Each structure stands twice: as C-alpha cells, then as structure tokens.
Design a protein with these regions (language model features):
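Helix-turn-helix repeat elements of alpha-solenoid scaffolds
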Residues: 54-70, 141-160, 189-201, 243-244
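Flexible helix-coil transition and linker loops at the boundaries of alpha-helical arrays
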Residues: 35-38, 68-82, 118-124, 136-140, ...
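Boundary at the C-terminal end of the N-terminal hydrophobic targeting segment
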Residues: 4-11
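Amphipathic alpha-helical repeat scaffolds of TPR domains
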Residues: 21-28, 37-54, 77-135, 170-186, ...
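Terminal, low-structured helical/coil segments at or just beyond the last alpha-helical repeat
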Residues: 237-283
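Alpha-helical adaptor scaffolds
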Residues: 165-209
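Surface-exposed, polar/charged faces of alpha-helical domains
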Residues: 77, 102, 109, 116, ...
Length: 283
C-alpha cells in the first residue's frame, strides 16, 4: 500500500490516488529487452559492441570530453532508471499529502471529542479554536513543503530523460503531467503563486491538458497576483498590461471550458473582461 488509510472519510480519496499511481506501468517507461525486434545486422552490431566493451573494460576511465559519455542519457536503460526514480519520488510526495489529510481529520476528531470543563467563557472557545487551526495550518504547510521537495526531485529526474522518442511516449507524458499538477498545487498552497506560472504553461502544452479548466483557473489566479504586485510596487505599465491580459485570457478560457460559451457565466466574464479594457471579446 502506498498511502495510509486510517480514516474512512479519506479512504476513497486515498484509493483514487493509489489507483492513479498504479496505472503508471509499474515503474518502467519502455521495455529494455527487445532483442526480438532487432534486425540481424543490429544483433550483430550489439554483440560486437559488447565484445569491444569487454576488451576495453576500465572502471577507472574518466573521459576528458564529456560529450560522448552523455550519449548514455539517450538509452532506454538510463531512461527507465530516471523514470523509476521520478515515479518513486512522486509516490512519496502524494503519500505525504494523503497522510497529512488523515492526520488532520484524526486531530480534529480528537479535539472535538475532548471535554472542555475549564471553558466558562465564549472567548475561551474562540481562542482554543484559533490555536487548533494554527496547529493544523502548520502541519499542512510542513507536509506540503515536504511533498513539494519530492515532486521537485521527480521533475528533475524526468528532465534527465533526453531521448525525444521516449519523451513522446504516453507513459512519460502521463507521469510528467501528474508530477507537474501535484507540484503546482503544493507550490500554490505554499503561497508561491508566481513560481507556478512556468510549470502551468508547460503543463497545458502536454497533449490535451489545455482542455482542463482548473489549469487555466490557477493561471488566471497567478497572473492576477502578479498584476496586483505590479500595482502595489508601481511597476512598469507594460508588465501590468501583460499580466492583466494573460489573467483575462485564462479566466475566459477556464469559464468557457467549465460552463460553455452560451452560458450566463461566460457572458458575465466577457463583460468583466471588457470592463478591464485589455481584450475585447464578442458576445
């Protein structure tokens, strides 16, 4: 089992997350033992290469020119190793988040069941609730930071896979999308909104991810944050208009994807954007 499932209320979420991870092949990006698919010439060359490597075996060799050595990053073996490491870190990150959710639910339950004979005044209850929320917030932020570290490592491992053909495989794109999405949510919750923008932009470039309205919702929010920061710091107008434009583009796209162009929600957003005087959209 990848995730702790101590509380029934979170069991469904935990199982859904586990199922999502289990679909990622079992940690292999591409089969390595594919001799059956090789031509006779390729088999012959492979045998000759193995013989040459055996003759020239020198574990202490350190190449001065790294270019030739870097070619191993294009191999299936290297790609599979990096894919497994990325998957392992992704699983650890998700597991960290799920365990924290279980802990929060258990903590709230235990606090609610405690007898409060010493609480005689309403303000005492308010003060206690505030303390409890501070504890929950602190634990949530710690878990999200720990998870973010795992997700960042997963991204780094996937970035190491240089073979363009392997990067186009559905297994690679699936894991990359899952890691990006989890990284974005954790980073956003840690109040690092500007940092989510480049990863969000990369996310919507993968296959049909652009059709997911939450990605545009997050982008609109992040660009809105940047716009407001420019206002507060009295930054350059060109940057202000740039962020405002991008905010409106993604706000409109998120509304279109969720509600449809014929919906009252979409028409309302069009009016809001037109009042923003950045882009004009025909209703």
């Amino acid at each position: 089992m990848l995730f702790a499932q101590t509380q029934p209320a979170n069991a469904q979420d935990s199982q859904a997350a586990k199922d999502q991870v289990d679909e990622l092949l079992k940690g292999e990006l591409v089969p390595e033992n594919d001799d059956a698919e090789l031509t006779e010439d390729q088999k012959k060359r492979k045998k000759e290469i193995m013989e040459q490597e055996s003759l020239w075996k020198n574990p202490d060799f350190k190449g001065y020119n790294k270019t030739f050595q870097e070619l191993h990053q294009l191999s299936k073996t290297f790609a599979n190793n990096q894919f497994r490491l990325a998957l392992s870190n992704y699983q650890s990150g998700v597991n960290t988040i799920m365990k924290n959710r279980d802990w929060v639910e258990q903590y709230r339950k235990e606090e609610a069941e405690k007898k409060r004979l010493d609480e005689k005044w309403y303000w005492q209850k308010v003060d206690r609730k505030a303390r409890e929320e501070r504890v929950v917030y602190r634990e949530k932020m710690k878990a999200k930071q720990d998870a973010l570290n795992y997700f960042s490592k997963a991204i780094n491992h996937l970035d190491e896979i240089k073979n363009p053909d392997l990067r186009e495989r559905p297994e690679f794109k699936r894991l990359l999308s899952d890691v990006y999405r989890s990284w974005i949510m954790a980073e956003y919750d840690l109040q690092n909104l500007p940092q989510t923008i480049p990863i969000l932009e990369l996310y919507i470039e993968i296959d049909d991810n652009e059709k997911e309205y939450p990605a545009h919702k997050y982008l609109a929010s992040a660009y809105s944050f940047e716009e407001n920061m420019i206002k507060k710091t009295k930054g350059p107008d060109d940057m202000l208009f740039k962020y405002r434009y991008k905010k409106n583009v993604h706000l409109l796209r998120a509304t279109e994807l969720k509600y449809g162009k014929d919906s009252p929600e979409y028409k309302h957003i069009v009016n809001v954007i037109n009042r923003d005087e950045v882009i004009s959209v025909a209703q």
